């Protein structure tokens, strides 16, 4: 197996981090104490490297999701490898079986990978060009406590669904965020944060999107209420396709996701979407992000 050949044990994983973060040749690195390049050697009793001159220690895992984790470094790397090999992700239950760890540990590992390594909502590079924008709502059937009493004393069930906003460049990247509400101010605020004013915006006819032509290059709408889904270049099929992939993937792999952790799963699917045409493998991309 290719993974085991490259990362046969914790020492091999630590050496990869050391070379990626501090020492290209595996021997010399900039010593903060000496303030110059020095030779370092591996400390046998701890996951660090020591300067041959002054004894200062450098820790390859410092500032990463692996730092001070009781889970072995090889298992962390293998979790990222497994997560990168599927189109729809891997559940905590399956990872528990694959790694031989507890469900709690598996869930925590996946949660950190999604929210630390796959989160691109804060990416400073905004979207540009032709940008499709749409919102979807995530949530299942209401539970027993999700009821409201109407004025006539009748109990009715409510659907507490969570809005997710998607913004995608045609042929390019996507930004997707879980929103606290689907109000116009909230949606437009996120759009202005992630999309350049020089962009042409494509949306449906929802009133929330009124007035976008004032702050962007242009705004074209498609009238879904009239059963029109494509009108020349006006459509939102790209972003709708992403939402379909996301919902089908979550339903098939994770079955259900709570609102509290929903952004992490949105991060995961957006991260994969943004690398659909990349030459670099998803595993290599995750490793690079972990070492950044």
Which residues does each predicted region cover?
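Residue-level recognition of single "structural anchor" positions
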Residues: 1-292
């Amino acid at each position: 197996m290719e993974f085991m050949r490259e990362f046969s044990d914790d020492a091999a994983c630590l050496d990869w981090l050391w070379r990626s973060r501090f020492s290209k040749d595996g021997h010399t690195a900039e010593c903060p104490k000496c303030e110059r390049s020095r030779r370092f050697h591996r400390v046998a009793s701890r996951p660090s490297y020591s300067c041959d001159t002054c004894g200062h220690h450098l820790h390859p895992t410092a500032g990463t999701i692996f730092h001070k984790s009781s889970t072995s470094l090889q298992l962390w790397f293998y979790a990222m490898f497994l997560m990168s090999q599927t189109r729809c992700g891997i559940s905590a239950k399956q990872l528990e079986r694959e790694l031989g760890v507890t469900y709690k540990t598996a869930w925590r590992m996946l949660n950190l990978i999604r929210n630390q390594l796959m989160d691109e909502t804060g990416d400073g590079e905004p979207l540009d060009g032709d940008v499709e924008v749409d919102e979807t709502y995530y949530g299942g059937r209401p539970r027993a406590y999700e009821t409201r009493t109407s004025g006539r004393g009748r109990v009715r069930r409510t659907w507490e669904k969570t809005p997710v906003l998607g913004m995608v460049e045609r042929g390019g990247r996507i930004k997707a965020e879980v929103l606290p509400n689907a109000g116009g101010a909230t949606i437009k605020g996120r759009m202005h944060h992630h999309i350049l004013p020089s962009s042409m915006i494509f949306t449906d006819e929802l009133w929330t999107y009124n007035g976008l032509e004032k702050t962007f290059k242009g705004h074209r709408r498609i009238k879904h209420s009239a059963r029109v889904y494509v009108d020349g270049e006006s459509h939102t099929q790209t972003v709708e396709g992403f939402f379909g992939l996301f919902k089908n993937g979550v339903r098939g792999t994770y079955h259900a996701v709570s609102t509290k952790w929903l952004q992490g799963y949105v991060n995961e699917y957006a991260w994969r979407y943004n690398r659909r045409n990349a030459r670099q493998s998803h595993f290599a991309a995750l490793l690079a992000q972990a070492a950044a």
